[in-house]
Amino acid sequence: MKKMKAIRYYAPQDIRYEEVDIQQPGDNEVLVRIQAALTCGTDVKTFRRGHPVLIKKTPSGFGHEFAGIVEQVGNNVVDFKPGDRVVAANSAPCGKCFYCLKKQYNLCENLDLLNGAYAEFITVPERIVQKNLLKIPTGLSFEKAAFAEPLANVVHGVERTGIQPGDTVGVVGIGPIGLMFARLAKLKGANVIAAGRNPLKLKLAKDFANADEVIDLKKYQHPEKIFKSFTQDGRGLDVAVECVGLPEIWEKMFSLVRKGGKVHLFGGCKSGTTVNLDTRRLHYDEVQIISVFH
């Protein structure tokens, strides 16, 4: 059997660069030669502390955002051929379970998951081939195409949030996800305030996301005052989006929004994490909480 180089996940903070067998595609599967693989916040969290959903058993393939070239297809595959440029989501719903029938596909009870992008090849299973393997348009690079999966997560988050033209939206945490959230909110017609600490990302919040205001959180002990200063009569944000995944940031988000505002908790915290919330604020000010599993 042919071999390839791959990063394998064994345990939190234990990943290994190894030579492993290339998994030959079954009749309904596709073997892809990786051309670009990204590292997202979920990969970093998984490396640091594991993951309750992505890693079912160890050792496991690692990495889940990728684009590449079809190397080989199974006997029954007709929609793809060797040489096709493709990108895939790392999951696909069953379409039959309780949640799928309610069209909550990301909550599927039998979600098919795919890890192994940090390798020379990856074998895409049947369900993902059928539902979430896509050809890359001519002119789009592998590096940009690999953003399809995280961008889809953000699109889902923006749709669930219900951002309207003219809303004032604050995004806290401007890594790749936060930057895409800010950019899409801007495209929705919102006034966008982006906040973070990294100078490079603060610059990207302006240059890439076109944020109306950018806040360097290192400079302010009470950033909620700065956010509110950019809103009508200092009432607070229409929507506040958390893209960090830390409980102390979750708790602070509720001080940023106006009465009737929305707090979107997009960044996932460690399993078992609890937070303290001001119940008076939630109840009497009718603050809405949205939390999206991508």
Please describe what each predicted stretch is.
Residues 153, 177, 201:
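Hydrophobic/small residue at the entry helix of a nucleotide-binding pocket
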Residues 94-172:
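NAD(P)H dinucleotide-binding glycine-rich loop of Rossmann-like/cofactor-binding domains
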Residues 247-294:
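Glycine-rich phosphate-binding loop and adjacent beta-alpha segment
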Residues 23-37, 51-98, 135-139:
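Glycine-rich beta-strand-centered segment in the early N-terminal region that forms part
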Residues 71, 193, 264:
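Conserved beta-strand positions in the Rossmann-like core of class I SAM-dependent methyltransferases
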